[in-house]
């Protein structure tokens, strides 16, 4: 399959979609880009119109419902130079590509795949210079797009440049490639050699932040790719949004977290689906989702249970801690403003809320003593 894998950017090449349905779905792809591949399509049960893998990659007319913003977390606010975001003091994001192995229908950066977008830096030299000039940055996240879509020699140039910056200790690669095209790893020993070099020869550490959304993505090929990357000394973790019709039921989420822990890819975050344009069909109410997450955490091992349920809000990563009959509790896990670090907030419940901004009745807030620590 690896060498024969083909990418598909036009629905007309997917024979399993009837022509009448395809014409309706093309109204969606005129607005939001479409991309899949033959390997990922092979995971779909085409007899089930609500198949979760299908929902991840095949458009639905529900995406045309007006809702949310293209830049729901206002990432542009933190763009310091072309292609670089600097939101938290110790962390920089480099947007290195505007292409992925597939385009998830719920992507919070779907704006990058639009013709008029210019946020990604194909030449990262300006971003690298910014990092060199900011010694507080000790870890860099390569993102996009999917950095593993880049040719290995291009990724090598970026990693070698980062390896030469003394204060950068950790490089993270945010990628769904092992889920959507594990042959990127299986068929490219040079990529594995690059990862091993970075971990053993630079005095620094590489992390691969995976995006497995559903247990059926954990195929034998994906598991083998995980194993090969682990052998390079790279640490693997996973993060996924909670997605309606994909992983928002107890058994699916429990299985996903358990299997990830078993193969050595411990869950890191489960995210509230961002209110990005086109995403309403995938978003779940916060107060239902916290019940789901807590129920699953109560039934899995400690390795899986340590996952945090958070929102990537404009102001920072806000953890959803729990609720009572009347109130819901939040805490800043990461805050852009030092004054908000560790802040604990109590709001009156809102069963219709899908995002932090939907909570308007603040009951109490408590500043952490951390806010004064530097």
Curated annotation (Swiss-Prot):
Q: Which organism is it from?
A: Aquifex aeolicus (strain VF5)
Which keywords does this chain's UniProt record carry?
Answer: 4Fe-4S, Iron, Iron-sulfur, Isomerase, Metal-binding, Pyridoxal phosphate, S-adenosyl-L-methionine
UniProt enzyme class? isomerase
Q: Which residues belong to any copy of the Radical SAM core domain?
A: 86-314
Q: Show the CDD domains listed in the entry.
A: Radical_SAM (cd01335)
Q: Which residues carry this modification: N6-(pyridoxal phosphate)lysine?
A: 317
Q: What is this protein called?
A: Putative L-lysine 2,3-aminomutase aq_1632
Q: Which cofactor does it need?
A: [4Fe-4S] cluster; pyridoxal 5'-phosphate
Protein family according to the UniProt entry: Belongs to the radical SAM superfamily. KamA family.
- Give a single Pfam family match: Radical_SAM
Protein EC: 5.4.3.-
Q: Which InterPro entries match?
A: Aldolase_TIM, Lys_aminomutase/Glu_NH3_mut, rSAM
Domain of life, source organism:
Bacteria
- What does the note accompanying the cofactor annotation read? Binds 1 [4Fe-4S] cluster. The cluster is coordinated with 3 cysteines and an exchangeable S-adenosyl-L-methionine.
What does the entry list as the binding residues for [4Fe-4S] cluster?
100, 104, 107
Molecular function (GO) terms for this protein are:
4 iron, 4 sulfur cluster binding; isomerase activity; metal ion binding
Identify the taxonomic lineage of the organism of origin: Bacteria, Pseudomonadati, Aquificota, Aquificia, Aquificales
């Amino acid at each position: 399959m690896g060498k024969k894998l083909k990418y598909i950017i036009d629905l007309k090449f997917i024979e399993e979609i009837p022509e009448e349905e395809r014409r309706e779905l093309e109204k969606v792809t005129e607005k939001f880009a479409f991309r899949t591949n033959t390997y990922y399509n092979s995971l779909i049960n085409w007899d089930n119109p609500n198949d979760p893998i299908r929902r991840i990659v095949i458009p639905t007319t529900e995406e045309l419902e007006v809702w949310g913003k293209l830049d729901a977390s206002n990432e542009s606010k933190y763009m310091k130079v072309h292609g670089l975001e600097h939101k938290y003091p110790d962390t920089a994001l480099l947007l290195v590509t505007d292409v992925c192995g597939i385009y998830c229908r719920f992507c919070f950066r779907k704006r990058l795949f639009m013709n008029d977008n210019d946020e990604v830096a194909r030449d990262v030299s300006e971003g690298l210079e910014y990092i060199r000039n900011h010694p507080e940055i000790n870890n860099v996240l390569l993102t996009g797009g999917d950095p593993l879509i880049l040719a290995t020699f291009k990724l090598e140039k970026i990693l070698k440049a980062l390896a030469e910056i003394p204060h950068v200790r950790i490089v993270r690669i945010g990628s769904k490639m092992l889920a959507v095209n594990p042959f990127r790893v299986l068929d490219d020993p040079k990529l594995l050699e690059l990862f091993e070099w970075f971990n053993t020869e630079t005095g620094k550490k590489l992390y691969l932040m995976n995006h497995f959304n559903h247990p059926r993505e954990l195929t034998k090929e994906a598991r083998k790719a995980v194993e090969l990357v682990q052998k390079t000394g790279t640490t693997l973790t996973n993060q996924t949004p909670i997605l309606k019709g994909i992983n928002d039921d107890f058994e699916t989420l429990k299985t996903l977290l358990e299997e990830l822990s078993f193969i050595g890819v411990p869950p890191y975050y489960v995210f509230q689906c961002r209110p990005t344009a086109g995403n309403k069909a995938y978003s779940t109410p916060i107060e239902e989702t916290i019940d789901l997450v807590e129920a699953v955490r109560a039934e899995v091992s400690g390795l899986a249970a340590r996952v945090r349920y958070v929102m990537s809000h404009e102001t920072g990563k806000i953890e959803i801690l729990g609720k009572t009959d009347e109130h819901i509790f939040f805490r800043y896990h990461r805050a852009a403003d030092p004054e908000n670090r560790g802040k604990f907030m109590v709001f009156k419940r809102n069963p219709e809320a899908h995002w932090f901004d939907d909570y308007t009745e603040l009951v109490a807030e408590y500043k952490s003593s951390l806010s004064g620590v530097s």
